[in-house]
Structure formats: structure tokens, C-alpha cells
A protein has these predicted regions:
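Macromolecular interaction modules
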Residues: 1-266
Length: 266
């Protein structure tokens, strides 16, 4: 099983931030969830109240996608026609994309083509420089450090990062897991901690903007802030200075599950 992280920044003019989040969750997400080979899909919408704290979100959100293997990305299966993927029983989704012929004839357009057209009017895909802060794309395998239970109401922080110049990928991943991971596991109030290590073979398949990402869960923003002022957080941050390039991409959110076909929910 592989995971893909895709950062999200809203289109600069098409919607307010509130409208962006609503459309992403109610239209674009369910549309992409029709992709047959997609096993699981979770959206993360950065919380408005988190922008005044630390860590502060740098993105409006992020999506995570689960696929069976890297072969799905290497050799994507043919995409179904839109009117085969989205049916009348899908009601609102059908009327929005199929009934309206929103991006073209639904009998000719594929689901993938429709998703991409919808993507362009929802997210910031402008080529204006600087580009670094706009892009977050990582193909990885997860390594669970703290295997605790979570609930939908918990706060989740995602950090996406690149290794410090001079570190080979294997050196970076070894220290991240064996040293940094153990430091992170000691954070007060932490319920679950997952590292996601980029796959070396994936770099040749699609461009990756970072070398990995971490996911960490707390009960609420107050618990996160209490953890941030702890000696354990200071030790983690000090080690991070030897490991990561800065700034990182950051999302502070709650999980919104759009699709889940995996047994046990993880």
C-alpha cells in the first residue's frame, strides 16, 4: 500500500476560503472518489482558528490518497467515461457534472479528464513564481511510530519536509525513523504518530516536492499548544534542525474521510 500527499491552496480568485472548502468537500472530493483504483481518500481542511497559533498552517489543506501499489501510478488503468462513473443515483453529483455537461459531453469525457478540469478551477495552479509554497506532492509508505486510536474530532497536524542539503535519502530516513521518531513519540498528549517515507523508485515516476511527511494527532488545539511548550517539543525541534530544510509545509486540520475501502479503516 502506498500513500500520496497532495497539498491544497485555493484558486486565487474563484472562491472565498469558505466556499473553497465547501466545494472541495461536497463536489470535487466525491467526484475523484469515483476513481476505481483509489482505495482510500481523506481530506484535511486547515482550521480557521489554527492560523493564530503555532504551528501555523501554510496550506489551505491537503488530500491523502491510498493505492495498492506504485504500479497504479506507473501504469494508470484506463479511466471510465464520466457518465459511467457518475450515475443518476449520485443525484447532486450527477446534476453538477453530468446533467450540466459542465466540462464537456459526459459520454466522451473520461472521469480523469473531468477531475483535472475541475481541479484547475478549484486549486491554485498558476505558474507564477515563486512556486515552492504552492506545491506539495509526495509518494510514500507509512511507518507507524505511535499506534494509538484516533477519533474524527481530534486535531491532526501534517508536516511535509525535505532533507537538509548534504544528507543522502537513506541517511535522512534512518535518522528520521530511529532518532527523530523516538523523540516525537515522547510528546505530551500525542495519541498517534505516523511517518511517511518517500519511495526512492517513485522519484522517477512523478515529480516529488518533498522527501516525506509526518502525521500527528492530539485531542484539541489546546492539547497541541501545551505539547508545543514542553521540553520534549524543544528536544524534537533541536533534532529537526539537523535533519530538515525549512520552511516546512504545514496543515492543522481534522480528517474528513471521503472514501475508505480498506479493512479496519486504516
Amino acid at each position: 500500500m502506498i500513500k500520496v500527499l497532495a497539498g491544497a491552496i485555493k484558486h486565487p480568485v474563484n472562491r472565498t476560503q469558505t466556499e473553497f472548502h465547501e466545494y472541495w468537500q461536497s463536489r470535487h472530493g466525491p467526484l475523484f472518489a469515483k476513481t476505481p483504483e483509489l482505495r482510500k481518500y481523506v481530506q484535511h481542511h486547515s482550521l480557521p482558528e489554527s492560523y493564530g497559533g503555532t504551528p501555523k498552517p501554510t496550506l489551505h489543506g491537503a488530500s491523502m490518497f491510498w493505492f495498492d501499489s506504485l504500479d497504479v501510478l506507473r501504469n494508470p488503468p484506463p479511466s471510465p467515461r464520466l457518465n459511467d462513473a457518475v450515475r443518476q443515483e449520485d443525484q447532486v453529483l450527477f446534476e453538477w457534472y453530468v446533467g450540466s455537461s459542465r466540462y464537456g459531453a459526459p459520454g466522451r469525457m473520461t472521469l480523469r479528464e473531468t477531475v483535472m478540469a475541475d481541479d484547475r478551477q478549484l486549486f491554485d495552479r498558476t505558474p507564477d513564481w515563486p512556486l515552492g509554497g504552492k506545491r506539495t506532492s509526495i509518494v510514500a509508505q507509512e511507518r507507524v511510530i505511535v499506534d494509538g486510536p484516533t477519533t474524527p474530532g481530534m486535531i491532526k497536524v501534517i508536516w511535509a519536509f525535505s532533507r537538509k542539503p548534504g544528507l543522502a535519502l537513506d541517511e535522512f530516513q534512518e535518522h528520521w525513523h530511529d532518532v527523530h521518531g523516538h523523540l516525537g513519540a515522547r510528546l505530551p498528549g500525542l495519541h498517534r504518530y505516523v511517518q511517511n517515507h518517500s519511495l526512492p523508485e517513485a522519484y522517477a515516476i512523478r515529480p516529488m516536492t518533498h522527501d516525506g511527511f509526518s502525521e500527528a494527532w492530539w485531542d484539541d488545539l489546546e492539547s497541541l499548544q501545551q505539547s508545543r511548550t514542553s521540553p520534549e517539543w524543544d528536544a524534537l525541534s533541536s533534532d529537526g534542525q539537523t535533519l530538515f530544510s525549512y520552511p516546512m509545509a504545514v496543515i492543522v486540520a481534522r480528517e474528513t474521510v471521503i472514501k475508505d475501502t480498506l479493512a479496519g479503516g486504516r
